[in-house]
């Protein structure tokens, strides 16, 4: 990850501010945290996927140490970054061209002009429990997500106003990958700037097929306007992210990939 960040940054692509370190030097990461009071994420610098060894929303030195120990089980080189506001988008690039984009859409509430977000969350959780679904906690991710929208649990959204209440999946749901369960096709929302960023990333890595992960609050504007970043690249991207089993809809990029393979 640090090498990819370096390659991208040298070519003008936005990546997270970060610091690499090893477990013995975890206090360096604690110093980094002081510059990012809204929280950081610690992760292995190499060799993992699906959120393995990743700890989000770190706020204290002791949490940095604990997260570093966990990450070190997967890789001796560690990485700390600030939490980035927004949802995660996977842009799939094939032969230098963006072919599909999906979003890991966080849960949302709709305001009624009277109720606080805390009250709306309580009602939503009652509905979720009645259906045997996991309720949403007003945890650090919820507070962080509300904060970057200028909201809190005591805010009263306008009638019809949609409020994002979670950016990262609940880690207790072990069957769910952190930030990597994509459930909405958003190819039509991707602005030219993000498209060019994804295609440039694929070119830098000299990869015919790559999934470029962005974190942004708005995919319709460039990253320098939204504060977003390229968070990760996957040179063996899973097509299951682009397939909606609930609707039995076929993944749009699959025929393109097969055609590209069979035409060579």
Q: What does each model-found stretch correspond to?
A:
Residues 3, 66, 196-200, 252, ...:
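Long, highly charged amphipathic alpha-helices
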Residues 70, 74, 125-220:
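A long amphipathic alpha-helix within ATP-dependent nucleotide-binding catalytic cores
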Residues 1-142, 191-196:
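Active-site nucleotide/adenylate-binding loops and adjacent lid/helix of ATP-dependent enzymes
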Residues 86-88, 95-99, 207-209, 223, ...:
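Coil-to-beta-strand transition motifs
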Residues 42, 78, 210-212, 231:
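Hydrophobic faces of well-ordered beta-strands that scaffold small-molecule active sites
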Residues 3-7, 41-44, 171-176, 188, ...:
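Short amphipathic alpha-helical segments, especially helix-boundary/capping motifs
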Residues 180-189, 203-207, 216-264:
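C-terminal active-site "lid" helix and adjoining low-complexity regulatory extension at the edge
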